[in-house]
Amino acid sequence: MEVKVFRVSGYFEKDGRKFKFTKEYRALKEEHVKELVYSDIGSRHKVKRRKIFIKEIREIKPEEAEDIVVRRLSLEL
């Protein structure tokens, strides 16, 4: 199994306001990425899963990653 790089974009609602986000993760499958997004955004911003809306999950090349940690981990191997 090969670890892939995914870019996730969407928004979450808190206190009647909408906040956009774009995140990059390394994972084996899209389902794993969804779980990471819900866990990460929920814990950082104290938002319930039903208030997190994922618009797009896209697989990208490791070279396209903007997050330095994700890029370095992906290109090391």
From Swiss-Prot:
It comes from the Archaea. InterPro entries: Ribosomal_eL20, Ribosomal_eL20_dom. It holds the Pfam family Ribosomal_L18A. GO terms for biological process: translation. GO terms for molecular function: large ribosomal subunit rRNA binding; structural constituent of ribosome. Keywords: Ribonucleoprotein, Ribosomal protein, RNA-binding, rRNA-binding. The keyword Protein transport does not apply. SUPFAM superfamilies: RplX-like (SSF160374). The keyword Membrane does not apply. GO terms for cellular component: ribonucleoprotein complex; ribosome. Belongs to the eukaryotic ribosomal protein eL20 family. Part of the 50S ribosomal subunit. Binds 23S rRNA. This is Large ribosomal subunit protein eL20. It comes from Pyrococcus horikoshii (strain ATCC 700860 / DSM 12428 / JCM 9974 / NBRC 100139 / OT-3). The lineage of its organism: Archaea, Methanobacteriati, Methanobacteriota, Thermococci, Thermococcales. The gene is rpl18a.
